[in-house]
Amino acid sequence: MSLEGKTVLVTGASGFVGTNLVNKLQSVDCELLTPSSSELDLTSEESVSKYFADKTPEVVLHIAGKVGGILANKTYPGEFFHKNAMMSVLVGHYAWLNGAEKVVSLAAGCGYPKHLQVPYREDQFWDGFPDENSYGYSLAKKNLIVQSWSYREQYGFDSTVLLPANLYGPHDNFDLESSHVVPALIRKFIEARDEGRDEVVVWGDGSASREFLFVDDTVEAILKMVDCNESGPFNLGTGVETSIKELIETIRSCVGYEGNIVWDTSKPNGQPRRFYDMSEFERAVGYIPSTPLSDGISKTVKWYEENRSVARI
């Protein structure tokens, strides 16, 4: 489906992925809807109902969500559950009710069971309880998948759900209390370098592994999925496993920090291992995202250093 001439709604347009997605869509001849939270409260049925009835978007790219790192998820699990559950249900329902042709949504890769053999396959997604550090967020986001399946079965409504790996890149949230691992570490190492600190303290022991996906690859995948007439969910990553220790060494190198790294083993590692089998995504779309971690980190460091005055910190 070409987006040319379509009315395209991007939820979460001012957020990390949303900002990058909107930047990409600026070159497409479509009517682009990017409402602020004051214009469209995605947790309010009254607000969502009215907005969709007034604007009748033909394509909905549902990127919005209440997101954060381990600390934020452990501190506010109820808030993470409520906001994400409401968004998950309302956006899909009112898109269908008002005649949208397609919805593409981002769910949560952390919804996979905590104890699972890697690489993760989509048919394992419901085989156990997710990691307890982010269960409120993870379980709320699973509503997107149930809704996609059930609305396709009953109404023939076309929506697709993606399970992104750990995302990073320009326009990310660099707030140390609410950010994810990559932006938090980039900020910590840059500040340590600039202030001449002898050491940087990081959580865990570095043994946990993750899969890191550059935001430009994420945007490309979302747009390609507009043409996929399947619910999924589909893993969205690179298929490459990276330990937190490797990640930190990459960030240290890109930043140019020469001090010591101190591991605070009293803090949780989170889920032990997580990376994806990307065969289903490749079957559906025909490629696998492939920006090397070192390239993506370098671009993110450069963006942050050039935009500290406007970055979310």
Regions found by a protein language model. Name each.
Residues 13:
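NAD(P)H cofactor-binding loop motif with strongest signal on the N-terminal glycine-rich segment
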Residues 16, 20-24, 191-313:
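C-terminal substrate-binding subdomain of Rossmann-fold SDR/epimerase-dehydratase oxidoreductases
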Residues 26, 30-50:
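Adenosine-cofactor binding site in Rossmann-like domains, unifying the SAM/SAH pocket
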Residues 45-85:
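NAD(P)H-binding glycine-rich loop region in Rossmannoid oxidoreductase-like domains
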Residues 70, 105-121, 136-142, 154, ...:
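Conserved catalytic-site region of short-chain dehydrogenase/reductase
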Residues 89-134, 160:
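Conserved Rossmann-fold NAD(P)-dependent oxidoreductase catalytic core, especially the SDR/UDP-sugar
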Residues 111-113, 136, 160-182, 209:
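Flexible, glycine-rich beta-alpha linker
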Residues 132-165, 184-194:
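Active-site Tyr-X1-5-Lys
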